Structure formats: C-alpha cells, structure tokens
Amino acid sequence: MARDLIGPALPPGFKARGTAEDEERDPSPGPALPPNYKSSSSDSSDSDEDSSSLYEEGNQESEEDDTGPTARKQRKNQDDDNDDDDDDDDDDGFFGPALPPGFKKQDDSPPRPIIGPALPPGFIKSTQKSDKGRDDPGQQETDSSEDEDIIGPMPAKGPVNYNVTTEFEKRAQRMKEKLTKGDDDSSKPIVRESWMTELPAEMKDFGLGPRTFKRRADDTSGDRSVWTDTPADRERKAKETQEARKSSSKKDEEHILSGRDKRLAEQVSSYNESKRSESLMDIHHKKLKSKAAEDKNKPQERIPFDRDKDLKVNRFDEAQKKALIKKSRELNTRFSHGKGNMFL
C-alpha cells in the first residue's frame, strides 16, 4: 500500500521512494557480488525454505516403511552425492571483485625466469615436488626419505673383517719396502735450503734509529757465516783464500832487473851514503827503536786517573786505522820508479 504524498509533485524522470520492504529488496550500495553469491536477505529466505523442505522430507521418510538394508544404502548414497555436488558448487566461488566482461581467468601463473645458478642434476624444484606429492603421496614419502642429507660416514654394507695381527703385518711390510727401496730420490743427499742454515740479514731498526742524515757509508759488519759454517764450507773457503793469495802474489812480483840497472843502482846507493846526509824517514825509525828499547827496560808503574786523558773520545776508530795503514803501504808504488827500466 503506497503512502499518500503531500506536497508538490516530482518532476518527470524522477521516481518516488518505495516502501521499507522495497528498500530492503533493492541492492546494497558498493561493488556487485560475483556470480553464484546471494545477498543476506536472499540467504535467509533460502535457509527458511530449506528448513521447511527438510522438515517435509523428514516427515515423508518417517511415513515410508523400511523394506530392508538395500533401501537404506540407496538413500545413503543419494545423500552423499548431494553433499558432493554442494561442495563442488561452493568451491567454484571466489572472494574479491568480479573480472570485467571479456577477461578470462588464468588457471596457472606463467613460469618465472630462474635467477641464479642452475640446480644440479637430480634436484627438483619445490613446486614440482609439491605437485608430485599431490599426485602420489606414497611416492613423495619414499623420495623424501631417500633425499635426506646424511651427515657422517656411511655404515658398512657388509661384515667388517679387522684383525690386529694383519694390521701389524701390513705396517711392517710398508716399513720394509720404504727402507729397501732404491729409488733415485732416496740416493740423492738431502740438502737444506739456505734460510735453514744461514743467519738472516741484519734487521733494520724501523722507527728507532736516528732521524738525521748519514755522515758516512754503512760499515760492513764482516762475514757472519762463520757461525753456521760446516767443515766442508771451511775447507772450501780455505782453498779460495789460498788461490786468492797466489793470484795477488803473482801480480806483486817484480820484474827481473837487467845487469845495467843493477850496476847503476849500486853506484847510486854508494854515492848517497858517501855524499848525502841521512833521510828524515831513517832518522824517525831510529828514534822509535831507541825509545821502544828504553820503555821496555823501565819498570811498570800505576798511572793515576786523568780525566782529560782517560775520558777522551777516540775518534780514530779501528776501521779508519786499517784504511790508513793500507794506503800507507801503497806510497812506495806511487813515489818510486816504474816496473820497467829504473834508469833512463
């Protein structure tokens, strides 16, 4: 029964509001429900109809007479088939907005490209394993049991034959073969490397030395190999020193003077002794010899402490002393006649 409208009439193209029952029947605002779904009002009405139909079916079943177990089984099978059909209908539905017309639902997503190294042979992807397990669950259990990672040594497949006596015999045989083996490697003498037998080089005092320029070159510390020399090395070095001395002596050999040079040398020496005075070098040598003889005859006395004398720094070290003596020996070669003719 429509309500009486009081007021001006609606313009053409507009509809009047219906009753409350009509409003309930109108669809609710929002996205439309997908197919195979019904609104809550329709569900409630359907549930009422289903309950009434079930009640009527129950009354009919109570009125029917059970003729035997076969009739009960038939009714049970029919009920199971109806339940399966209902479950299939429920599974067809899905949640979410419906696809627009013209679009088809894809059953499976396209395979994604594999990023990374390929799996080794014999391995299956997790998706393939799950599909295989769905098809054959019994086979999946056997495969999983076989593919389990085994940690540790595998157990022996057969009986283990271990005997202490056989182990000792094998070990003795190996030692015998090692001792009696006449290979070329065993015949060669074992020579150790140089870093095992020689002293290392002098370590630099990194960060601990003086932070000034060097006033002179580094003094050689001498031969340090004497600490690690073997008898064979000492013999070899002795031979080398002898050969070096022979070669140096050959170089220092004077040339044989001729008869004329010898005669002229004797005349010059006799003239110098008779006509010339004694040289300063000879005078100095004579004084040193006489002084050394006097000091030898004097009794040794204890000398008192002298600060200036005893605490004086000796700047003339041993290396400089040796270098000066070596140079002084060469004076005779620098200021003497040549190795050829003594006289023109």
From Swiss-Prot:
Modified residues (Phosphothreonine): 142
Region entry Disordered, spans: 1-309
Crosslinked positions (Glycyl lysine isopeptide (Lys-Gly) (interchain with G-Cter in SUMO2)): 275, 312
Acidic residues bias: start-end ranges: 58-67, 80-93
Modified residues (N-acetylalanine): 2
Positions with biased composition (Pro residues): 111-120
Positions of short motif GPALPP motif 4: 116-121
Entry-annotated residues carrying Phosphoserine: 28, 109, 144-145
Keywords for the protein's UniProt record, in alphabetical order: Acetylation, Isopeptide bond, Phosphoprotein, Ubl conjugation
Keyword Acetylation included in the entry's annotation: yes
Composition-biased stretches (Basic and acidic residues): 128-137, 167-191, 231-265, 273-283, 291-309
The protein's name in its UniProt record: GPALPP motifs-containing protein 1
Organism, as annotated: Pongo abelii
Lineage of the species this protein comes from: Eukaryota, Metazoa, Chordata, Craniata, Vertebrata
Gene assigned in the entry: GPALPP1
